[in-house]
Amino acid sequence: MKLFVGLGNPGARYAGNRHNIGYMAVEAIAADHGFGPWRARFQGLTSEGRLGSEQVLLLKPETFMNLSGQSVGEAMRFYKLTPADVIVFHDELDLAPGKLRLKQGGGHAGHNGLRSIHAHVGEAYGRVRLGIGHPGHKDAVAPYVLSDFAKADQDWLADLLRGIADGAEALARGDGAKFQNAVALRMQPPKPEKPKPAAKAPEAQAPEAAPDERSALQKLADRFR
């Protein structure tokens, strides 16, 4: 079994926040792949289904972001999972909006949700880093991540979530390259068609000469006129 964790904060107040893009990612997977209904478990909401041959549990911790590790740890203990079975979807300030990167293990880079997971299960789990951009100053980070995506962000956000759902099966079986390719196909605008070369106008042909119907005697006489 694989455990896909989407980080965010519970409640309608936070639903459209940049900080909740992890929630949005696992919700897109559940909707696109016919997962079961969300139900309360492990201090969060879970939905079960299959991605290819892999049984997958989707988890949205409802502990609020800073205590996400409590929920993740509880689910892992119940199913006897290791960090290698876990992939966490989270917002990433250090990536431009719409960019996506995979990471296995390593530090939490100051992300409070990851910090909590580190404290409960260690750092060896996988992450899908979802770029939301940086507001430019550290004092602006909290209000920025706790604000809704702007209207101008909606198109790339929808494409990103569709790409994540498209590639989820590849991610579950460990094919990170194919997962990223699925996302890239959604994010890249279609290339404009090359204009077809204009058809060449047919060359004008000289009019055919009228056939000479003179008799041999007339032709001879005309030569001496």
UniProtKB/Swiss-Prot annotation:
Region forming the signal peptide: none
Bias (Low complexity) ranges: 198-209
Chief site of localization: cytoplasm
Classification via CDD domains: PTH
Annotated site residues (Discriminates between blocked and unblocked aminoacyl-tRNA) in this chain: N9
Region (Disordered): 182-225
Marked site: Stabilizes the basic form of H active site to accept a proton: D91
Residues at which tRNA binds: Y14, F64, N66, N112
Active site: H19 (proton acceptor)
Superkingdom of the source species: Bacteria
One GO term (biological process): protein quality control for misfolded or incompletely synthesized proteins
Molecular function GO labels: peptidyl-tRNA hydrolase activity; tRNA binding
Reactions performed catalytically: an N-acyl-L-alpha-aminoacyl-tRNA + H2O = an N-acyl-L-amino acid + a tRNA + H(+)
GO cellular component: cytoplasm
InterPro entries (alphabetical): Pept_tRNA_hydro (IPR001328), Pept_tRNA_hydro_CS (IPR018171), Pept_tRNA_hydro_sf (IPR036416)
Subcellular location: Cytoplasm
Pfam families assigned: Pept_tRNA_hydro
Entry keyword annotation includes RNA-binding: yes
EC number: 3.1.1.29
Subunit structure as annotated in this protein's UniProt entry: Monomer.
Family (UniProt): Belongs to the PTH family.
Known role: Hydrolyzes ribosome-free peptidyl-tRNAs (with 1 or more amino acids incorporated), which drop off the ribosome during protein synthesis, or as a result of ribosome stalling.
Record-linked NCBIfam families: pth (TIGR00447)
Entry protein name: Peptidyl-tRNA hydrolase
